[in-house]
């Protein structure tokens, strides 16, 4: 059982899809960056070329 006493994400915990809390956090931030670039008329493809998606 996981106790709710952690002050930072438990990197050893995985959800059903195999993602850790840090994976969710980085995915969320990447989405927000892309949304902001689109709003500002930025080039989204340049962002994706810098990120390595496996």
From Swiss-Prot:
The keyword Mitochondrion does not apply. It comes from the Bacteria. The keyword 4Fe-4S does not apply. Keywords: ANK repeat. ANK repeats lie at residues 17-46. This is Putative ankyrin repeat protein RC0701. The lineage of its organism: Bacteria, Pseudomonadati, Pseudomonadota, Alphaproteobacteria, Rickettsiales.
């Amino acid at each position: 059982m996981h106790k709710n006493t952690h002050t930072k994400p438990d990197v050893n915990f995985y959800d059903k899809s195999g993602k850790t809390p840090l994976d969710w956090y980085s995915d969320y931030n990447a989405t927000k960056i892309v949304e902001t670039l689109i709003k500002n008329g930025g080039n989204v493809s340049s962002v994706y070329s810098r990120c390595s998606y496996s």
